[in-house]
Amino acid sequence: MNKWSAEKAHEWYKNQEWLIGANFLPSSAINQLEMFQPETFDEHTIKTELKMASALGFNSIRVYLHDLLWDIKKEFLVNFEKFLVICDKENIKPMIVLFDDCHRSNPKLGKQFLPLKGIHNSGWSQSPGHEIVKEIHEGKLDQLPRLKKFIQEVLSLYSEDERILLWDIYNEPGQFGIGENSIELLQHVWGWALEVRPSQPLTSCMHGSIGEKIIELNKENSDIITFHAYESKNLESIIKELLEIRRPIICTEYMAREFGTTFEFSLPIFKKNNIGCYNWGFVAGKSQTHFGWETILNLKESVRKKDFIFEDEGIPEPKVWFHDIYRKDGSPYDQKEINFIKNFLK
């Protein structure tokens, strides 16, 4: 089956509230695997933090899965159902991300990395990982059946589940140096997803992906247009460009204080243009995305020094937070931000 018509996409979008939320990872997890693996699934923290999100006025979140979770399918599905029940109780509809080209390669199930002090997303895992992406690009296709099974079984299982808002099938294809080597896997994923054709819309971002062919492929196949924008100077020009496609638009990543895409700057622009929006990060925790991207350059040296944060240690803070909104104790980074968001959403 093909992508939705523009008319169907607009009809779906009109039936949603104005979408506002965060890219969500519980503060007790360092990555997607730690969030859902049975050994580390933290139902209490997820409940607490999604209650905070609902109280702030958020009605959606964006959450990443991982292909390796399908290797422990039975345990994962139990935890995913618990997660969906919590979301539903808080009137939050999750957008689910399936693949991702960002951060650490060579993902593995089991015990995950300890956080590295002051390093942005030091343990986030690519899915399926650049090594597999490169193999597929080079014509080595032995991983394709496993990946197809993950994509199609997830989409089929939840294809009529009204608790799920939307499927973001591949986050930022081409990022972290892989470039247009991701095009072959992305083509497969679009084909697999459209074969299932779930009742929810399908997307993969335009701005945020790397490579003209990749961006064009996402544009041609997405039911809903999605994009990422962290620099205030580019936000309105990106929106102007995307409005010409004449489909509903959602910004699935924004809010880097250092680059000016604060809530105070961004939310009025999104609301004026009827664009849903998901800032990066909610409660600062093991992923440490309240530290800036530049800290990633220190990752190898931090590993060499074994500069880890152990379970009994607190999370350090930069003077100015890059992403995220709250601390683990529930206190906000900036109460003025909280006041602004709540007043804006009244």
Give residue ranges: language-model regions.
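Short beta-strand and adjacent tight-turn residues that come in two discontinuous sequence segments
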Residues: 63, 97, 227, 279-280
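Active-site neighborhood of phospho(di)ester-bond hydrolases with catalytic His/Asp-centered motifs
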Residues: 205, 227, 250-253
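Active-site mouth of glycoside hydrolases
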Residues: 1-222, 236, 245, 258, ...
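Active-site metal-binding loops of divalent metal-dependent hydrolases
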Residues: 172-173, 229, 253-254
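Substrate-binding cleft of secreted/luminal carbohydrate-active enzymes
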Residues: 20-21, 248-252, 256-346
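Hydrophobic/aromatic ligand-binding patch that stacks against planar heteroaromatic rings
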Residues: 86, 241, 269
